[in-house]
Amino acid sequence: MSSLAPHEFSPETTWLNTASYGLPPARSLAAVQRLHAEWAAGRTAPMADETVVDRIRDGFARLIDGASADHIAIGSGVASLLAPVATALPTGAEVLLAENEFSSVSMPFVHRPELAVRVVPLERLADEVRPETALVAVSAVQSADGRVTDLARLRAATRAHGARLAVDITQAASWFPLRFTDADYWVCATFKWLIGARSVAFFAAAPEAADLIRPLGPGWFAAADRWAELYRPVALPATTRRFDSTPDFIGVYAALGGLDLIEEIGVEKIGAHNLALADTFRTGLVKLGYAPVQENSAIVAVPGAGEAAERLQQSGIIASARNGGLRFSFHLYNDETDVERALTAMGENRASV
């Protein structure tokens, strides 16, 4: 199985670390270099063409079936985009979180001591929703080990009890099918599976969900008519764009290149590719005597093997130590040779311990 875009990537290592950081495609690198050169020469400013923000907003909306650009706000990180959701909850409201949830999802709620935060195993999340639950916040795909949340089942549970659902799709967007009606609020960083930029993230909400929260400290970029309101703020837009923060335009150019490439290839094709590589790797690990987490995911985790990450890096295999385990992640630029190299390195690691 070959890379889905060999002309866009030329890593010098076996990069199996997309769950930490995606590799930028050549088109993104070229766009950023060109923008920097023009800026340094005084021919333009990074924000001279605001339509690039419209394009990236449209592109992200197309990743979620049923979403439109009016449902999308641009920001810089998951936690800050979740802050309005957390702040809108009344004192004593119950928030349900999964055990070992990534901290950018949990911290906006955990650090509001007036909320009643309850943490349960991921597999019991839907069963634990109850009438007093105000909100469930969860990642569609878990950062630590790649376990996949049953969003349809969880959505049914939240609807049955009148709870809201916030979903982080940072580890899912690009390879995992997403349906807008499966959550009230969506957040996503672009620098991992969207092969974008560290400084660009998205928030999505339908009007009825967005109307339950309000922007915290809106800036000039969130104005209904931003250039007309620079010195006399009048109104925020009726769309989810009112949650915009001023974007890093250089990051937007980088993220746009990644989104364009993902759309050209297609989520379905990327998902099939990633899952096939991950499944082959998972099967190989079992044959070597390891016990990886069994999940149909592009992330493969080996519990208790986190100490091997540094040894693998010395062999040019880039993975991550997370929550005591060793985490590998397979994306569109990986191929079967990467799987073979990683299995060889894991075999050598097995023999050395």
Description of each model-found segment:
Residues 1-353:
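Pyridoxal 5′-phosphate
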